[in-house]
């Protein structure tokens, strides 16, 4: 049986998005034993800065729902909202409220995963599988931890999470990581 996961690192300005397909037909101990998760789509959606707040958010939600309609995922997973600066708080809260409302109107379920839970999972994976010691992980910031996790998890099948100039697309990486986390914790 196959299931599709849509995962969102959703925010006001830009949102990482991933659609992954997992094969649940035969149990496996780890990803490397059997390619059980396939990234069908991943990208960063940018909202239109020229628009006022609500139309800007609506445009972003429309893009997400178009992708939902194309892939028909079984579950939507979102990273919990995080507000880094008070100047952006209102718009981030609007964005999440409008997304929740639209999904509710379509009777679509969304699961939320806290950022700290996701990062802790990545660190645990990297230390448990002996890619790094806890001390070695201290050299990385949170964004780099996710990138290192994805490199370790996917190995040679690594999804593209860097620009041509080697800049980490952290929103995209987080969205992919959310799909992997949901698969490993809830579907395996």
Residue ranges and their predicted role:
Residues 1-188:
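Phosphate- and other anionic-substrate recognition elements at nucleic-acid/protein interfaces
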């Amino acid at each position: 049986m196959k299931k599709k996961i849509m995962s969102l690192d959703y925010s006001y300005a830009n949102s990482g998005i991933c659609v992954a397909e997992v094969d649940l037909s035969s149990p496996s101990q780890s990803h490397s034993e059997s390619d059980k998760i396939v990234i069908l789509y991943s990208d960063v959606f940018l909202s239109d800065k020229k628009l006022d707040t609500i139309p800007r958010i609506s445009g972003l939600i429309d893009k997400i729902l178009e992708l939902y309609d194309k892939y028909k995922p079984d579950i939507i997973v979102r990273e919990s909202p995080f507000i880094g600066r008070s100047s952006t708080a209102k718009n981030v809260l609007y964005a999440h409220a409008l997304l929740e409302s639209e999904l509710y109107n379509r009777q679509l379920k969304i699961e939320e995963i806290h950022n700290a839970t996701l990062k802790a999972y990545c660190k645990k994976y990297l230390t448990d599988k002996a890619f790094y010691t806890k001390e070695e992980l201290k050299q990385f910031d949170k964004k780099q931890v996710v990138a290192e996790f994805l490199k370790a998890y996917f190995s040679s099948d690594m999804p593209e999470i860097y620009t041509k100039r080697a800049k980490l697309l952290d929103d995209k990486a987080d969205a992919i990581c959310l799909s992997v986390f949901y698969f490993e914790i809830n579907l395996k």
